[in-house]
Amino acid sequence: FGTDLSKQASIEPDNVPFIVKKCTNEVEKRGMDFEGIYRKSGRTLLMKILIGIFSKGDDPDLSEEGEFSEITIITSVLKQYFRELPVAVIPPDAYSKLTELITADEKDLNILEIKKCIDSLEISHYNTLKYITRHLIKVSEYSSVNLMNIKNLAVVFGPTLIGSNEICPEVDFSSTGIKVKIISVILENADTIFPDDK
C-alpha cells in the first residue's frame, strides 16, 4: 500500500499487482449479485487488518469461511489500494490528454485517439487498467441484481483510478464529473481500447 504500481506489478508475470487479482477474483467468485457492490463500505477494523496482511506481502484467505467473509471489506480494500498509489493508474499526463479528448463535442468523441493515449501508458499501468476494466464490465453484466451499471461503477472508480490533484483540491473536486466520464467511456468502448491481441 502506498508504493509504486510499477514496482509491485513487475514481480507478476502479467504486470498486474497481486492484490488487484486476489480481490477481483474473490468478487467474481461470490460478490457479483451483491447489491451496491463497490459502493458500500466494509468495516474499518477488518479493512485495516486486511491492508496489513497485504502490506506484509502475505496471501490472505479471502474465502467466505475466513475472517474477511464480508465482500465489502475486500472491495473497500481494493479501492483504498488504488487511492493510495503514489501515481494513479491513469497518471496526470494521461488524465490531461484524456480530459481534452473527453470534453470535446460528444459526436466528435474519437475513441481511437483515446486508445492511443491509453496505449502510451507504462506497461503496468496499461495492464492494470485493462484488467480492472474487464472486471468492472463483468460486474456491470449483473447490474439487474447488483444495481451497479457502467455509470454507477464509473462514479465509484473515476476518482479512484485517476487520483487526485493535491496541489489544488478545489480544481480536482470540480473535475470529478470528467473523471467519471473518462471511466464511462473506457468501459463502454473496452473492446476497441483493449483489443485481445495486445
Predicted features and spans:
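Alpha-helical catalytic/interaction cores of small GTPase-regulatory modules
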Residues: 1-198
